[in-house]
Amino acid sequence: MSKHPGSKILYERALRLFARGVTHDARYFKPMPIYCIKAKGSKKWDVDGNEYIDYWMGHGALILGHAHPIVTEAAVEQARRGTHLGASHELEIEWAEKVRRLLPCARNGYVEFTSSGTEATLMALRLSRAYTGKQKIIKFLSHFHGWQDYTIIDYNQDFSHILEGAYPPGIPDGTLQSVIALPPNDIESVEETIANEDVACVILEPGGASMGYLPTYKPFLEKLRKITRENDVILIFDEVVTGFRDAPGGAQERYGVIPDLSTLGKILGGGYPGGAIAGRRDIMGLLDFRDEEGWELRRIRHPGTFNANPLSAAAGNACLGLILKGEVHPRINHAGERFRRALNDVFEDIRIDGLAWGTTDSIVYVGFGFSEEDLKVEDIEGYVEFQRKKAMNKEPIEYLDKAMINRGIHPMGARFILSIMHRDEDLQYTIECFEDSLKELKREGIISEFAD
């Protein structure tokens, strides 16, 4: 508290204005969140002048780091020209052309811009139902697709409540009845459900639940692709996180599994708001204007004040242009791999039962009491056990976050999200602070050494 008097004052003001005191659930933090005023590269600074190496990176949107000069210049130049032209513009075409060049499922398809990833997933679900004429949606437990009604039914809820059939309030019964939530990576449950239900689509995070916290693996994706194709079920990859991060073409490029539709966000906008759906022409064609009798009764409408907003398009073009040069991913993946290995070495050296992991090299998770086997969830029993261990991590991870923040490191809960601006010295200092923080937690009895 003594290092953050300015944040304390701002939080007290915020509590009078916002019901939850913050503007995003993930930013809620006890005793208060930190309030930042500027950021550059891998660093950010709070209102009290404290400097942090940042591992939130705009919730994963900033693969190029904060205020990248090329992206910033593009956005500033467009702001001078106008932030909303109320008309079509060339930047939206260039932006879509880059998405097409990068994303395998879009290369012979269409792109449709939205204002957020949540909007993109909503549109993908609607397109799937309209195209197939079927009603049911399969999603996987703990996979996040925005806060919209269809896919929020289980996310961040007590898993025992979900298994007992208790859902978040405010979601209509009809919506709940149209969604089938299955255990992650359980291909047998998928086969059985598709055989017995009116399934329009399957949606998932291809890198795994919650930004890859609970991993998905290539063999499952390959089987899922085969089953959905054989049964005329639309496969949707939610690549809001993995798009342009796992590889230039996202998880679908990395795993070699091409979905029918993909949803995008975060990196797409270069740090500015934006989302998109991309994929098959016959499905996306439902958005088209046609002079066919009765077409207007079948057509999917898509208004949106900030669709392909020029400011986001300018920043997104600049960001994707740098990714297309091919220099971003070798650099960030190499750094992430070394960073993950180093964190695991720390766990081993100071005898703490912990694990660092990640399905993409540039997002690294840490947890206590996890093993590699715990990450291989393929049925409801494995999922329940994984969630039990995750629940046990809540308190020690909160203490770890506080210890790291007080040392000038800002992790995003249990995850470290890297950018190309994280230098070797940033990572080395983070590793040292991680070790010091673990030792502090061990001294205070929050975590303990593993037994021989």
Residue ranges of each PLM-predicted region?
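Conserved N-terminal phosphate-binding loop of PLP-dependent enzymes in the Aspartate aminotransferase
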Residues: M1-D452
